[in-house]
Amino acid sequence: MKLDAPVMQEEELVERIRVLLPSITEHAAQAEQERKPVDSVMKSLEDAGVYKFFVPKRYGGYEFGLETFMDIGVMLGESCLSTAWVTTFCMEHNWLLSLYNREAQDDIFGKQPYIIAPGALAPKGTATPVDGGYRISGRWEWATGVMHADWVMVGALTPTEDPKKPDLCMYLIPRDEVNVIDTWHVAGMVGTGSNDIEVEDVFVPGHRKQSIVDMRDGSSPGALFHDSPIYKMPMMPVLGLTAAAPAVGGARQAVALFRERLQERSVYGTADKQSQRAMAQARLGHAQVAVETAEVALKNIARTVVHWGESGKPCPEIERAHLRLKIAHVVREARDVVRDVVEASGSHAHFLTSPLQRTLRDMHTLSAHTVFDLDVGGELYGRLLLGLPANAPV
């Protein structure tokens, strides 16, 4: 059977990825050294078919579901957080393209089976209307996936009939028309290679523009074009879950490493192993339950998002804010699990050869992502509960 045969089953793709996990784990330190995912690892994931996960069946994709996507994100995060982050983002960005108008999808999916693209959607660009499209200029941070990309997605404020109310739109630009600026010198998630990107007066045809506002509640052009409910899910919760799944995997990895560490580490001044001490046993038990609870919460949130896609109704703003805050709490819990087990693992956990210290740095960096900001998310949801207008996009 061909690798890209449309009869691929979700379980088969999951198993293909599972086979790659030892290699992904083995190359995690190299990804950090190179400040980007390792080329051979990314090629193996691409060959396994991961980027066709969300591509519509009409274009030869798999059109798989969100819950299995969560399983994959957790699995990958348990092996290498940086590689997981890039892979899940680039998988999900094929879902974003599937929300575009039909002409854009025919243009791109009609010529290639999937895209590998960062999504730098902050409104850091300008869009100037011209015949047939727009001239785009700007510079964007956080271009996760750009080191292996063939396209980029960027956000730009776009003029409307009301000059005081520009529209925030997403534009698709070929990678070879983009400059990559080496800015990714960070404490954690070093292996993502999420450098800045810049474009200068690049022409983008009109059909490769999509209003982000029209994608937020699940009523995008793609939602009307495709029959599957996965393209009717609200955008921001899907983006949040995309980033949260690797975090839960990172916490699972940390707990597993902590368990191994307890069986090796001696209590200073005694012949006892740390695993024989009640306090260490209790910490392990609490950490295991905490990460299991976070994973259950992650899957429950995903089911709620799927429900909104299946309902055929736009997801209300207050529900999107609620989901955003719940996702942020999952990530905070996962981060705290890692922090707690590293604290109990002794000084050896902080050697650069220890994967625990890398996971700790990665989790602190990952949890600083704007979608996981508990203060902003809490205020936003609280305002809506009180009948006040939202003060942040959701």
Which residues make up each language-model segment?
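Basic/polar N-terminal segments that are highly enriched at the extreme N-terminus
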Residues: 1-15, 19, 392-394
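Short, contiguous, pocket-lining structural segments
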Residues: 9-12, 16, 33-37, 189-191, ...
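C-terminal helix-coil-helix/basic helical segment that borders enzyme active sites and/or dimer interfaces
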Residues: 25, 29-32, 293-329, 339-350
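Glycine-rich flavin
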Residues: 37-47, 52-149, 164
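DPxDG-like acidic metal-binding loop motif
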Residues: 139-178, 182-183
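Glycine-rich beta->alpha junctions and the first turn(s) of the following alpha-helix
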Residues: 194-291
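Generic structural signal for well-ordered, non-transmembrane alpha-helical segments
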Residues: 249, 285-292, 328-335, 361-364, ...
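Glycine-rich phosphate/cofactor-binding loops in nucleotide/flavin-utilizing enzymes
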Residues: 345-394
